[in-house]
Amino acid sequence: MKILFSPSESKNENCVKNPINENSFIFKELFPYRMEALKHYEEFIKNASLQNLQELFGIKNENEIDKFKHDLKQAPTQEAILLYTGVSYEYLNFKALDKKSQAYILENTLIFSNLFGIVRANDTLPFYKFKQGAKIGNFAIEKFYKEHFSKALDEYLENEEILDLRAGFYDKFYTPKKKFYTYKFVKNGKVISHFAKAYRGILLSISAKNQVKNNKELLANLPSNLKLKEIQIKGLKEEIVLEILD
């Protein structure tokens, strides 16, 4: 089973590994496309107004903005699973997992970076800023990655069960061409989005700790505060609705 996962806005600045190169990423043959996207990003930054940069980075402080104007091709890196520090990653708590669980995540998790596209959990990335949904002029980066990476990803996932724990936005980067599983969380009859990030991290952690091979095994290992409410079939998507009991 392969797990599709979202990135996060917040990141860990402590990057100490070598700068990116074609061996930094899955799909080595597609590295030039990543560099093309990065070129659009960096050229936009060079010519953008302060307002444009505030929108791109999702931050207001002008001094903080300056931190993200450096050449990412020369910047130090770290594994994607350690770079991202948002809510999902807090609840995953990768560093607290045992080696076997960590290895499971590194082997089976694909993260959808807003800037670098589809990466493995152990692919190395620099510290960068790119607010989800932000625009780089007329360059539609999500469409660009969908066009150039979907075929490779389809082939990579051909013989795998797919667990899609991404936020819905990342469908713009890739939509599976075969049956896949997603999760929705409800409490007191209402869909909750506020805690969805946390529970996605929890489900990834559970998958790793139990070395689950398919969605059926994940459902068999749910924590006591999550209860299966219903399963909805929507084309190729099988959406599992879980009720939060606490």
UniProtKB/Swiss-Prot annotation:
UniProt GO cellular component terms: cytosol
InterPro entries membership: YaaA (IPR005583)
One BP annotation, GO: response to hydroperoxide
Domain of life assignment: Bacteria
Protein's name in the database: Uncharacterized protein Cj0984
Source species of the chain: Campylobacter jejuni subsp. jejuni serotype O:2 (strain ATCC 700819 / NCTC 11168)
